[in-house]
C-alpha cells in the first residue's frame, strides 16, 4: 500500500513537472515585443540572449526526460538510474533558471555600473511573458527537487532498513 502511494505521488509530481516545463518552454518561445526608439525598431525575443536560449533548451530536455520516465518507470525499467537522472535534471533546471533570472534582472533594472539601461519599460509584453516562463521554470525546479527527494528515499530505504 505504501509503495503504491509513493508511486502515485511521484507520478503526480512528474506530471506537474512536465506541465511546468512545457509551459515555460512555450511561453518563453512565444515571448516577443518590439519598440521604436529614435526611429529604430528594437525587437526583444528569447533567442536574442544566450541565457534565455539555455533556459528553453534545459526546460525542453527536462520535458523530454519527464515523458520518458513517466512511460518507462511505469514498467519498472529504470531503477536506481532515475535518482541520478533526477539529480542531473534538477541541477540543469536550477542552473538555467539562475542564468535566465540574472538576465531578466538586468532587463528589468539595468546595470548602472556597466551603463546598461533597463529595457522592460520599452518592451513590457516581452518582460511579462519572460516572468511567466521563469515562474513556471521555478515551479518545475521545486517539483524536481521534491522528486529527487522521493527518488532518494525510494532507493535508500531498502539499504538502511532494519532487518529483524
Swiss-Prot record:
InterPro entries named in the record: CASP/CASPL, CASP_dom, CASPL
Topological domains, Extracellular: 30-53, 102-129
Residues making up the signal peptide according to the UniProt record: none
Transmembrane regions: 9-29, 54-74, 81-101, 130-150
Key words of the record: Cell membrane, Glycoprotein, Membrane, Transmembrane, Transmembrane helix
Sequence similarity: Belongs to the Casparian strip membrane proteins (CASP) family.
Subunit structure: Homodimer and heterodimers.
Protein's name in the database: CASP-like protein 1C2
Species for this entry: Ricinus communis (Castor bean)
